[in-house]
Amino acid sequence: MKRAVVLLVALACHRGSDDPKADAPSSCVIEHDGGVTQCFEDVGATAKQYGSKYCDEMHGRHTYFPAKPCPREGVLASCTKKPGTDLERVERCYRDEPGCAARCEKAGGTYQK
């Protein structure tokens, strides 16, 4: 029990660090035909931990940005998957809105236009 309390205090101190990027999401930007088509924003701690590996497995031209959210300009829709968990990830769609909606439904995510 004492170890659990020490761990919780340590985690609270880490989250309250002076680094403004500590809680920032990471992102994986995917481009086709000269423009951004999709971006995956890793919000949860576990999602951030594996974000770079996940991004490397994407097709097409992809770039991983630690501690930098997806671009907001040009977003047609988004899909939040596993909200409020360590695995929370948001897919932002810049083209092919119907495809985005279908992927979101299949993943059981929350779709927003």
PLM features: what roles do these ranges have?
Residues 1-12:
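Sec-dependent bacterial lipoprotein signal peptides
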Residues 14-16:
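Bacterial signal peptide processing site
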